[in-house]
Each structure stands twice: as C-alpha cells, then as structure tokens.
C-alpha cells in the first residue's frame, strides 16, 4: 500500500483535474477525488477526467465519501470521513476488491477503524489547513508520536 495520498482541492488557479494531473505527473500513485460540496454529476464529470489519468500513471483512484458512486464508477476505492458510512457497511456494499479507508483524529478512532476492517487510515490534521471545514484539533508531531506509541502497544 502506498503511503502518500494526494487529496484533490482547488485554488484560484488550479482545479480538481489539473491538480490531480500535476500530482500524477510528479510521481504520485494515489489520488482521492474530494469534492465535498459537489453534486454526484459534478463528481462524475471530474472522475471521467481524473480516473483515466490515474490508470495511465498506474495510480490508485479513490472517491471521498460516496460509496455508491465509487461502485458505479469502478473506482479503486473510497475514503470515509468520521461522519460517513461505517467501514463495515461500505465493505458489504463494495466487497473485498475495493480499498476502503477512513479518517481518524484520535487513537480511539484508529481502534474503531481497525476493528471495522479499514484498509488504511488517514490520521490528522497534522497542522492547520484551510482546505477542510470544521477542522479537528491539530495533532502536530507530539500528537502523532503519542498515537503511534499507542498503536504499537495495541499491535495495530
């Protein structure tokens, strides 16, 4: 499993597709299409451009949150936030061949996701960001160190 995942976002000059293209051209092998406020049709349109780029670059293509749409589009998987569908429920819908990841902000979140069978866990935030609304408390290096120590002791 690859360790670094590019999560799409927009800036004043770069859109979702262009950002994904640049990340892939830079060697990224793992792209999550994250369009929180978009309609399913808007996500479909962006996916229609990004998914072939991922295939061309032999990269994993995930959708954020949208389990049914990930299945419809034959994405490689889905990333689920803390308030989204539970991992085990998504697994029943998608099956074992899909990658299912989840968001964690605490060690307890990591334990829950591990129990539910998440393939990977995105932990954060490491630092402040404006790309995410309702940001959880920043973990920083000390927070990560504490979580990693607890994971090691728990055998996760």
Where are these regions (language model features)?
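A short, flexible beta-alpha/helix-coil linker loop
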Residues: 127-129
């Amino acid at each position: 499993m690859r360790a670094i995942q590019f999560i799409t976002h927009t800036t004043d000059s770069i859109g979702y597709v262009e950002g994904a293209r640049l990340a892939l051209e830079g060697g990224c092998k793992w792209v999550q299409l994250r369009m929180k406020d978009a309609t399913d049709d808007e996500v479909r349109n962006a996916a229609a451009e990004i998914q072939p780029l991922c295939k061309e670059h032999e990269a994993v293509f995930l959708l954020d949150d949208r389990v049914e749409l990930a299945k419809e589009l034959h994405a490689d998987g889905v990333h689920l936030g803390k308030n989204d569908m539970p991992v085990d429920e998504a697994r029943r819908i998608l099956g074992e061949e899909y990658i299912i990841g989840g968001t964690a902000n605490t060690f307890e979140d990591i334990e829950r996701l591990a129990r539910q069978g998440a393939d990977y866990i995105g932990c954060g935030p490491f630092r402040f960001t404006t790309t995410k609304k309702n940001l959880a408390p920043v973990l920083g290096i000390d927070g990560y160190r504490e979580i990693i120590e607890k994971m090691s002791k728990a055998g996760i």
